[in-house]
Amino acid sequence: MASVIKSVSFDCVDARALAGFWAAALGTDVDEDATSERAYVEAPGWGGPNMWFNRVPEPPSVKNRMHFDLRAPETMAAEVQRLASLGAKVQERFDSHTIMTDPEGNVLCVELGPADLQGRVLVAS
């Protein structure tokens, strides 16, 4: 039997604030016991993995070696706009995805949504 990813952990400056961003981005809630020191976001629909946010004293010193790719629920443009209203910042735009950072500078990508793909022919490379 293989291991399962239970949670993904973030080191951050303000655990409750960053958890709030990701909970809103993913359509779920921050655990009611969240503090600026630690916070927990349960995956929507028990689809795992969950997210832990832990306050650490040092700021990030290098580029993320891992990031989330989010599929837009409708269009990429609308999802990028929604995430920006929550505090994310656009870093670079491409036809197939947009690179953003969350409020603490962690990289994430937003990919095309189903409405973007309607009528398009996808070719495997």
Question: Residues of each region from the PLM?
Answer:
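Glyoxalase I/VOC metalloenzyme domain signal
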Residues: 1-34, 42-92, 101-125
